[in-house]
A protein has these predicted regions:
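Aromatic "clamp/platform" in nucleotide-sugar-dependent glycosyltransferases that forms part
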Residues: 79
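Short hydrophobic beta-strand element within catalytic cores of glycosyltransferases
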Residues: 96-99
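Nucleotide-activated donor-binding/catalytic signature segment of Leloir-type glycosyltransferases, i.e.
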Residues: 41-59
Length: 171
């Protein structure tokens, strides 16, 4: 199944994800808990999507790892995001990602895999076009770029370069 993982709060736009899923035949698991959980459960029921969308809450780390290992894709529908960490975890597991153009998502994901944040029509168009293609998306190159640009060694090297630049400027 395809997963969406995160705290169930307004900023994640899980309601738009659910509304955008109406034409999809795939199974979606929204993994997380939070203040929007009951509202989202009601929305799934009201849209007659209970056979395709499930909310799974209160999973421990090993259970979430298991979800990554069996997922065919990850969707990040947030309208505001710092990272998100789930993006890095999915790429590390070589899971194709579809997401909003927020945080570092556009830096790591091809533009054809992006929707406009907070725009339900954009998200629905993305899902209808790209969900059937998820098995064909190759994440190896993205994982290599991630390891090159976001590894601990890379971060240490960049930090060292910043310090060296600052030291040169002060001397």
């Amino acid at each position: 199944s395809i997963i969406a993982l995160g705290r169930l709060e307004k900023v994640k736009d899980s309601d738009q994800l659910i509304q955008s899923w109406v034409n999809s035949k795939e199974r979606l698991e929204i993994i997380g808990s939070g203040p929007e959980e009951q509202k989202l459960t009601t929305l799934i029921h009201d849209l007659n999507l209970t056979d395709r969308i499930k909310i799974v809450s209160n999973l421990d780390y090993n259970s979430i790892e298991g979800k990554y290992k069996t997922a065919s894709g990850l969707i990040v529908s947030s309208h505001r995001e710092g990272g998100p960490r789930v993006l890095l975890e999915a790429i590390n597991h070589e899971i194709p990602v579809l997401g909003s153009r927020v945080g570092m998502i556009p830096d790591l994901i091809p533009s054809e895999c992006l929707s406009e944040p907070g725009d339900q029509k954009s998200l629905q168009a993305l899902l209808e076009e790209m969900v059937p293609l998820l098995p064909q998306l190759n994440m190896e190159g993205i994982k290599a770029a991630l390891n090159e640009n976001y590894s601990l060694m890379s971060a240490a090297k960049k930090t060292k370069e910043i310090y060296e630049t600052l030291l040169k400027a002060n001397s």
